[in-house]
Amino acid sequence: MQVRGSDDTLEFADKFRNYSKEDGHAYKKMNNKKFVLRRKSKLYCPNCKTKNNLNSIYCKECGTLLEDISKRTYDFSISNILSNISLKDSFKVAGFATLILFAISIVLKLILRVSLGNYVSYISTFDLLLLINGGNLNILTNANSMMNYGNYYNFAFQICSLALLVLPVICMVVSYNIFMKQKNTDELTLVRQAIGVGVIYGIILTVLALVSRNSLSIGGGYLSSGYSLVYGVSFLSVLVRGILLGFLSILYIGTKKEYIQNNMYLGIFKQVVNTVFLGYFIVFVLLVLGYFIGLSYVYEFGISGSISNINIFVVISQLAAYIWGFANLNPVTIGNQNLFLTNIFSTSLSIDFKLCLIAFIALSALILLISGIKLNNKYKTHAKKTTLIFSGFYAILMGVLAVFTCVNVNGGSLLGYNVQMNMSIIFTLIISFIYSFIVTFIGFKLNNWD
């Protein structure tokens, strides 16, 4: 029988030591947030049934331990979430983000004065702030003259630019880091923060939309024409988009690494956001390169007259969203072109750009396949459950993208033309869910093959 020496014994003991004998730090890191001490019974000892104080750890009669270590669980019921939302902190974050955006709107108004001159005085700072958040501008005009009295014309301008939406997101990030980041202690708290900030931000924008409606009279006099204008941003449009902006921004930036490890839903949500952003960014870069090498796709959609005074990068950033939507097999309207997989070769687009669109479809399939492989690496089992959750989040995010990228200029009978660039929200939700589920599920299963 071999007897261990003293050195061997110490080396053997060090392998199973929990704490360092030099400075006392723990060798094995345990995630204590996964566990919590809970009372076995609120008042009575489980052993002798003696009534104890709520603060007691041991039974006063028999000494039985009244607490037990159990896995931490969260109550994500709607009533529990809504009843514990901190309205004060939510208002701080949403209000300060609005103040930052108001200052940015003042700067933008000064920049617009260079190109628009005195006409910029008709645009209030609040209007700019609401338009940055994707608000719809409605204009009602009444034309009066000696020969023509009381003719009403209605204009609707719905222009949501992704390039401008970056500004409120940045303001939300800054405000959140100042007022709320330190209080983000667990997944349930994060969901409450996101809902609270989203709702308060939407309400603030709604109030601004209701108080910022303007009226304007132009011209008039004997034998001359006069126009009266009533214009303002639709409160319903900024309410919906404000809630979505606040909720999604806080939920994404507040998701920590440990939340991704502990909560499958938050982990998949963050992966979906990264997947959509990656696809959009690649399409944007490729469209920019295509523009500089001479592809005339911007003019093939019949919108060149409407965008002649807009920076080309802003236009491409908008087109990239529609092309990414088409790459996910969604029907898309861009100017005079209605794009869908079945009619792509019957459109008037050049053959080069048609082939590019087919390549974008292949790109989206590749990205979703890789996402399926990543899901398999993180969650080895429950293929259908994880891919269903992924596809649900993916469809919702694509639907949100459709909401924030809608462009609809309705000139009415006075101007006589309309400009539309959008994705159908309903079709986008349905098709994106089915398409992403099929491709992601294939990627999940492919990773199981040896």
Question: What are the language-model segments listed below?
Answer:
Residues 102-106, 110, 114, 169-173, ...:
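Transmembrane alpha-helical segments of multi-pass membrane transport proteins and ion-pumping complexes
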Residues 84-97, 152-184, 241-261, 355-380, ...:
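Transmembrane alpha-helical segments in integral membrane proteins
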Residues 315-319, 327-330, 343-381, 387-390, ...:
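Hydrophobic multi-pass inner-membrane translocation pores used for secretion
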Residues 79-106, 185-199, 265-284, 380-392:
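Alpha-helical transmembrane segments and their helix-start/interface "positive-inside/aromatic belt" motifs
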Residues 1-72:
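Cys/His-rich metal-coordination motifs, chiefly Zn-binding "fingers/knuckles"
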Residues 181-260, 296-306, 377-450:
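Alpha-helical transmembrane segments of multi-pass integral membrane proteins
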Residues 38-42, 51-95, 253-272, 304-307:
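N-terminal juxtamembrane cytosolic/stromal segments of multi-pass membrane proteins
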Residues 86-166, 211-233, 291-359, 402-431:
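Long, glycine/tryptophan/cysteine-rich extracytoplasmic
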